[in-house]
């Protein structure tokens, strides 16, 4: 563990097309191996596909992120030789990061022909509270509910 203290949170510059920090973070999470231009094409392509079907793509993205973001998660805690799954509340920044990660992971597993179409379909599903990312959130909440008895082990 570091003795120097925590590093300050880095600011993310808003993306050039929509001027949104959320979309800039989303692009950074889609990015693989430092290929930001590819990630931008994927996200902007998905936003264009959504724009054809829905009027406001940014609102739909925000709604999808709100629907997918978890309120509680479980963390492993070792107490006297036994490991308990302790439910803990998720802070806002992690909530958004988890929502983005789950949306991207579940969109990569979809069957559509291209990544922008996969991402657009997953975002549309998530905004209507269905799809793989919503299943992941429900599963996380179920785990927390099942282990509610260990909530007093929070730290």
Swiss-Prot record:
PROSITE patterns documented for this protein: RIBOSOMAL_S7
Record GO cellular component, one term: small ribosomal subunit
GO biological process: translation
UniProt-listed Pfam families: Ribosomal_S7
Alphabetic keyword roster: Ribonucleoprotein, Ribosomal protein, RNA-binding, rRNA-binding, tRNA-binding
CDD domains assigned: uS7_Bacteria
GO function terms (MF aspect): rRNA binding; structural constituent of ribosome; tRNA binding
Subunit (UniProt): Part of the 30S ribosomal subunit. Contacts proteins S9 and S11.
HAMAP family with a match to the protein in the record: Ribosomal_uS7_B
Its biological purpose: One of the primary rRNA binding proteins, it binds directly to 16S rRNA where it nucleates assembly of the head domain of the 30S subunit. Is located at the subunit interface close to the decoding center, probably blocks exit of the E-site tRNA.
Family the UniProt entry places it in: Belongs to the universal ribosomal protein uS7 family.
Protein name according to UniProt: Small ribosomal subunit protein uS7
Species in which this protein is naturally found: Xylella fastidiosa (strain 9a5c)
High-level lineage: Bacteria, Pseudomonadati, Pseudomonadota, Gammaproteobacteria, Lysobacterales
């Amino acid at each position: 563990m570091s003795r120097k203290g925590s590093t300050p949170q880095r600011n993310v510059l808003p993306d050039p097309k929509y001027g949104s920090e959320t979309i800039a973070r989303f692009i950074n999470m889609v990015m693989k191996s430092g290929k930001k231009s590819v990630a931008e094409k994927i996200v902007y392509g998905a936003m264009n596909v959504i724009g054809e079907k829905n009027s406001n793509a940014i609102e739909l993205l925000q709604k999808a992120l709100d629907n997918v973001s978890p309120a509680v998660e479980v963390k492993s805690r070792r107490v006297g030789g036994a490991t308990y799954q302790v439910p803990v509340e998720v802070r806002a920044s992690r909530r958004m990061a988890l929502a983005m990660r789950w949306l991207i992971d579940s969109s990569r597993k979809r069957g559509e022909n291209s990544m922008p179409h996969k991402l657009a379909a997953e975002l549309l599903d998530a905004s209507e509270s269905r799809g793989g990312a919503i299943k992941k959130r429900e599963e996380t909440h179920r785990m927390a509910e099942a282990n509610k008895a260990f909530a007093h082990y929070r730290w």
